[in-house]
């Protein structure tokens, strides 16, 4: 529209506000922690709310890769925490809607499994640290490593033999 907000997003929230009054409406984003991109998302959410549309939460699809440092980089983790703070300050919930951490090595190296563990743990630590200021939730993209278009790459908490990986133990320790 003239305000630079994608019309399909505005229309989606108009329809949802009209026909789903009892359903939680979450703006769900698939991307990393790039400040410029998130600036635009936050502007879009404020625009929707200022237009009288209900937005109940922000979701982040955390599809991480071992070659990225997002879940290990203090600056990016601090930015992630600030997003949760902003969300709560604006009366919304924050959801990690789909987390996975893809390792491409076959079989995965122990160092990669340790980075995967740290990534899951770091994200959950931040969520837990923000639980008293508003709703935070955590969901995984899947549980068991297995071949498939969206499941390959040793990305989940259990191996193909249903044995917990180090990341599962890291989550338990973190909680």
Name every feature range the model reports, one short phrase each:
Residues 1-43, 68-82, 107-115, 148-164:
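Active-site cleft segment of glycoside hydrolase catalytic domains centered on the general acid/base Glu
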Residues 53, 62-76, 88, 141:
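His-enriched metal-coordination microenvironments in redox/metal-binding proteins
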Residues 30-33, 60-65, 99-102, 140-143:
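Active-site beta-loop-alpha junctions enriched in small/polar residues
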Residues 16, 58, 138, 171:
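Conserved, mostly hydrophobic/aromatic
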């Amino acid at each position: 529209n003239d305000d630079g907000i994608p019309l399909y997003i505005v229309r989606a929230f108009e329809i949802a506000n009209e026909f789903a009054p009892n359903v939680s409406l979450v703006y769900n984003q698939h991307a990393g922690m790039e400040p410029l991109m998130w600036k635009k998302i936050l502007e879009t959410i404020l625009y929707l709310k200022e237009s009288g549309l209900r937005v109940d939460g922000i979701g982040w699809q955390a599809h991480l890769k071992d070659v990225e440092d997002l879940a290990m980089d203090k600056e990016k983790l601090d930015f992630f925490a600030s997003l949760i703070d902003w969300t709560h300050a604006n009366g919304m919930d924050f959801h990690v809607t789909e987390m996975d951490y893809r390792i491409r090595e076959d079989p995965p190296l122990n160092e990669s499994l340790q980075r995967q563990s740290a990534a899951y743990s770091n994200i959950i630590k931040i969520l837990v640290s923000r639980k008293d200021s508003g709703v935070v939730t955590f969901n995984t993209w899947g549980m068991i490593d297995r071949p498939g278009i969206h499941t390959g790459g040793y990305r989940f908490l259990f191996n193909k033999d249903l044995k917990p990986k180090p990341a599962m133990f890291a989550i338990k320790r973190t909680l």
